[in-house]
Amino acid sequence: MARRRSCQLHQVISLFTFAVGVNICLGVTANRIKRAEGWGEGPPTVLSDSPSINISGSCKGRCFELQEAGPPDCRCDNLCKSYSSCCLDFDELCLKTAGGWECTKDRCGEVRNEDHACHCSEDCLARGDCCTNYQVVCKGESHWVDDDCEEIKTPECPAGFVRPPLIIFSVDGFRASYMKKGSKVMPNIEKLRSCGTHSPYMRPVYPTKTFPNLYTLATGLYPESHGIVGNSMYDPVFDAHFNLRGREKFNHRWWGGQPLWITATKQGVIAGTFFWPVVIPHERRILTILQWLTLPDHERPSVYAFYSEQPDFSGHKYGPFGPEMTNPLRDIDKTVGQLMDGLKQLKLHRCVNVIFVGDHGMEDVTCDRTEFLSNYLTNVDDIILVPGTLGRIRPKFNNHAKYDPKVIIANLTCKKPDQHFKPYLKQHLPKRLHYANNRRIEDVHLLVERRWHVARKPLEVYKKPSGKCFFQGDHGFDNKVNSMQTVFVGYGPTFKYKTKVPPFENIELYNVMCDLLGLKPAPNNGTHGSLNHLLRTNTFRPTVPEEVTRPNYPGVMYLQSDFDLGCTCDDKAEPKNKLDELNKHLHIKESTEAETRKFRGSKNEIKENVNGNFEPRKERHLLYGRPAVLYRTRYDILYHTDFESGYSEIFLMPLWTSYTVSKQADVSDIPAHLTNCVRPDVRVSPSFSQSCLAYKNDKQMSYGFLFPPYLSSSPEAKYDAFLVTNMVPMYPAFKRIWNYFQRVLVKKYASERNGVNVISGPIFDYDYDGLHDTQDKIKQYVEGSSVPVPTHYYSILTSCLDFTQPADRCDGPLSVSAFVLPHRPDNDESCNSSEDESKWVEELLKMHTARVRDIEHLTSLDFFRKTSRSYPEILTLKTYLQTYESEI
């Protein structure tokens, strides 16, 4: 995407430490940032395993200091454990647990004991180190959770707070459906949800793994953009491996984009620690955040984060449906309660904004449901597979002469009737995944069916001495799968009160967090303003992008004899002058403005035409305004009875074609004498028209129509559908998909939704970066043809959200479904494509569902420009993904 190029800005960090298994330690402090421009193509700079540190210093008065001490001084910040640089007394002074984490009646008014983890003495409030329930137990106050919901219309902050602080409470592996357990298991989280702003779920990025998603939350970038494409990965330029246990993950060269804490620091806002090593108890993390909130104004951070390894750890071990999951969820809720009680104790509960958010969901998975590549390939020892809930394949040895990704794909495609994975070249993956444009993403990718794993061979799964499976749950699947969805709750003075919002993608949260802090976001993949409806007041107001190229409105009629395109449309059932009448009809219909126009008559004399067609009389088919072209080019607006097009003089095909299909519309067959009909369009110069001869001479390529002749409103209007300006190149295999979509599915959706508006067109993304290819870029991939072959075709179907209202008379919210269909010479993606189209085409469309924003980036077009809805509402519509999944 256009913003995706921000991966070349790389503000990077050395932040992650992982313990064995899934116990995660992630962290950064405000001063621990290194700058790199790009991904460090030069020699690697690996962190030393044994830095020269004098650990004999002391942490007295320094526990969890925000400033990182540099060598040779020892450290007392939250990450010193990760870097083996803590002072000798760090555990003794900073990780105290004596006395427990709560006040009891017996402890109220106790004599201060400096060995205690937190205090219940009379002076603890003044010193900012009370246990979080001190006021409740010792002073008779109520727990935050027991108070009624209150609408906080303006922040109520103590003097010195220039902005409401933001606390990000992130939980690993929190499946969205866990929220159904409600207040009996999670009363504090449920109160945040019911009193604040929440969505039914939040969609993670693909792959639905921890590292990619935590860093996406921090940067607003897709993994292909920020570079963390998995929990483990190989960079062929670095010739280095990144994984959870190795030290290479500390190297800043892997981390792209600009995370929130860098955005804050660069704009003069202090950021606290973002993630915490697993050795630091949750209670200590909360108490530390609360203590930071009491720092002097010039030291106090404005943004904080808490990170919990649960419920992911238990979800892997027991599965998402195991009864053992209840206690980990109770523990998380207890920690949330400690935070909220602590904020109330500091009189900050009406001041601070809190985001409770997950990184991904969890699915029921066991070893028994594993596909082994050894059952498909004879050479599994020659490949490296990143296994599990997705598969990434590369050769075992670099520059392996016999390794061919296409051969691997062929040997894995549709080999068994019960196959539980689907192989793709990465450029053929659904565009909605945004998982291709990075050298760390292997050429061969396996999308694995939910609840299944993939491995090279059985030994690599059952390798434990017991031979038993050691997990019951996992994640990483397609990010539209309902079990992969996670939680989002926003609570505080800036969030709306008791508000439910539609689901959204986690790439959008970075912009929201910047808005909450009054920051200007760095370039990112989110759509700034699309989540304005979450907030009580909006500091950012998005504006409609400027149109770069305005269209032409053809004013010259060419003679039929001017065309020698090899196109015929013989209709022996009609009078001889039928086509001449149809051509005149093309020129004058849908006209309004009395503009003098000139056209060439049958004898080349100049004639006057006072009925110009500069604008349509009624926006019958462009219900939401004409799409804007956001790059320099040349294109014409062509009006017809049943559709309108923006015809490219560069690509010799429409950039878009729009039409509206009513619920009552009929689907008619094409008469036999018109099955091969293609008409020249006398409004467009022959030099800007396709040649039908090219298709006759190319047996591998056919053509289709963007407006379907099947939906023509009359026999006369049907001829418009056969114009060469409605024609696009299509592989014969793809025509089966396109024709079924137009003939059957469009009518089906129109019937179900009380009419739909359809906009369809070509996509050119030869370099699979998710962006519209320029003409020069296309020439690099397409030689010897004036008509480039699209890599994909898109279609956007819009109706009224309230199906009782017709699509063309909708005065309420809109509903949209969009598709980006790969244009390929075969239908191997669907293993049953030899069957009737009714058995497989719609499922293929659902796999390639997309957001309107995806299509806008792929085409450099801007849709929905003329509507009564607010622009933020339109952005919300554009960023919505129809997943076709069952309710969570």
From Swiss-Prot:
<feature type="binding site">
    <location>
        <position position="769"/>
    </location>
    <ligand>
        <name>Ca(2+)</name>
    </ligand>
</feature>
<keyword id="KW-0442">Lipid degradation</keyword>
<feature type="binding site">
    <location>
        <position position="767"/>
    </location>
    <ligand>
        <name>Ca(2+)</name>
    </ligand>
</feature>
<feature type="binding site">
    <location>
        <position position="360"/>
    </location>
    <ligand>
        <name>Zn(2+) 1</name>
    </ligand>
</feature>
<feature type="glycosylation site" description="N-linked (GlcNAc...) asparagine">
    <location>
        <position position="525"/>
    </location>
</feature>
<dbReference type="InterPro" id="IPR044929">
    <property type="entry name" value="DNA/RNA_non-sp_Endonuclease_sf"/>
</dbReference>
<dbReference type="InterPro" id="IPR002591">
    <property type="entry name" value="Phosphodiest/P_Trfase"/>
</dbReference>
<feature type="site" description="Essential for catalytic activity">
    <location>
        <position position="878"/>
    </location>
</feature>
<feature type="disulfide bond">
    <location>
        <begin position="63"/>
        <end position="94"/>
    </location>
</feature>
<dbReference type="GO" id="GO:0005615">
    <property type="term" value="C:extracellular space"/>
</dbReference>
<dbReference type="InterPro" id="IPR036024">
    <property type="entry name" value="Somatomedin_B-like_dom_sf"/>
</dbReference>
<feature type="binding site">
    <location>
        <position position="312"/>
    </location>
    <ligand>
        <name>Zn(2+) 2</name>
    </ligand>
</feature>
<feature type="region of interest" description="Phosphodiesterase">
    <location>
        <begin position="145"/>
        <end position="502"/>
    </location>
</feature>
<dbReference type="InterPro" id="IPR001212">
    <property type="entry name" value="Somatomedin_B_dom"/>
</dbReference>
<dbReference type="GO" id="GO:0004630">
    <property type="term" value="F:phospholipase D activity"/>
</dbReference>
<dbReference type="Pfam" id="PF01033">
    <property type="entry name" value="Somatomedin_B"/>
</dbReference>
<feature type="disulfide bond">
    <location>
        <begin position="569"/>
        <end position="677"/>
    </location>
</feature>
<feature type="glycosylation site" description="N-linked (GlcNAc...) asparagine">
    <location>
        <position position="54"/>
    </location>
</feature>
<feature type="disulfide bond">
    <location>
        <begin position="80"/>
        <end position="86"/>
    </location>
</feature>
<keyword id="KW-0677">Repeat</keyword>
<feature type="disulfide bond">
    <location>
        <begin position="124"/>
        <end position="130"/>
    </location>
</feature>
<feature type="binding site">
    <location>
        <position position="773"/>
    </location>
    <ligand>
        <name>Ca(2+)</name>
    </ligand>
</feature>
<feature type="binding site">
    <location>
        <position position="475"/>
    </location>
    <ligand>
        <name>Zn(2+) 2</name>
    </ligand>
</feature>
<feature type="binding site">
    <location>
        <position position="172"/>
    </location>
    <ligand>
        <name>Zn(2+) 1</name>
    </ligand>
</feature>
<keyword id="KW-0325">Glycoprotein</keyword>
<dbReference type="GO" id="GO:0034638">
    <property type="term" value="P:phosphatidylcholine catabolic process"/>
</dbReference>
<dbReference type="GO" id="GO:0006935">
    <property type="term" value="P:chemotaxis"/>
</dbReference>
<dbReference type="InterPro" id="IPR044925">
    <property type="entry name" value="His-Me_finger_sf"/>
</dbReference>
<feature type="disulfide bond">
    <location>
        <begin position="414"/>
        <end position="831"/>
    </location>
</feature>
<comment type="function">
    <text>Secreted lysophospholipase D that hydrolyzes lysophospholipids to produce the signaling molecule lysophosphatidic acid (LPA) in extracellular fluids. Its major substrate is lysophosphatidylcholine. Can also act on sphingosylphosphorylcholine producing sphingosine-1-phosphate, a modulator of cell motility. Can hydrolyze, in vitro, bis-pNPP, to some extent pNP-TMP, and barely ATP. Involved in several motility-related processes such as angiogenesis and neurite outgrowth. Acts as an angiogenic factor by stimulating migration of smooth muscle cells and microtubule formation.</text>
</comment>
<feature type="binding site">
    <location>
        <position position="765"/>
    </location>
    <ligand>
        <name>Ca(2+)</name>
    </ligand>
</feature>
<feature type="binding site">
    <location>
        <position position="231"/>
    </location>
    <ligand>
        <name>1-tetradecanoyl-sn-glycerol 3-phosphate</name>
    </ligand>
</feature>
<comment type="similarity">
    <text>Belongs to the nucleotide pyrophosphatase/phosphodiesterase family.</text>
</comment>
<dbReference type="GO" id="GO:0005044">
    <property type="term" value="F:scavenger receptor activity"/>
</dbReference>
<dbReference type="GO" id="GO:0006955">
    <property type="term" value="P:immune response"/>
</dbReference>
<feature type="region of interest" description="Required for secretion">
    <location>
        <begin position="855"/>
        <end position="876"/>
    </location>
</feature>
<keyword id="KW-0165">Cleavage on pair of basic residues</keyword>
<feature type="binding site">
    <location>
        <position position="210"/>
    </location>
    <ligand>
        <name>1-(9Z-octadecenoyl)-sn-glycero-3-phosphate</name>
    </ligand>
</feature>
<feature type="glycosylation site" description="N-linked (GlcNAc...) asparagine">
    <location>
        <position position="832"/>
    </location>
</feature>
<feature type="binding site">
    <location>
        <position position="210"/>
    </location>
    <ligand>
        <name>1-hexadecanoyl-sn-glycero-3-phosphate</name>
    </ligand>
</feature>
<feature type="disulfide bond">
    <location>
        <begin position="157"/>
        <end position="351"/>
    </location>
</feature>
<feature type="disulfide bond">
    <location>
        <begin position="108"/>
        <end position="138"/>
    </location>
</feature>
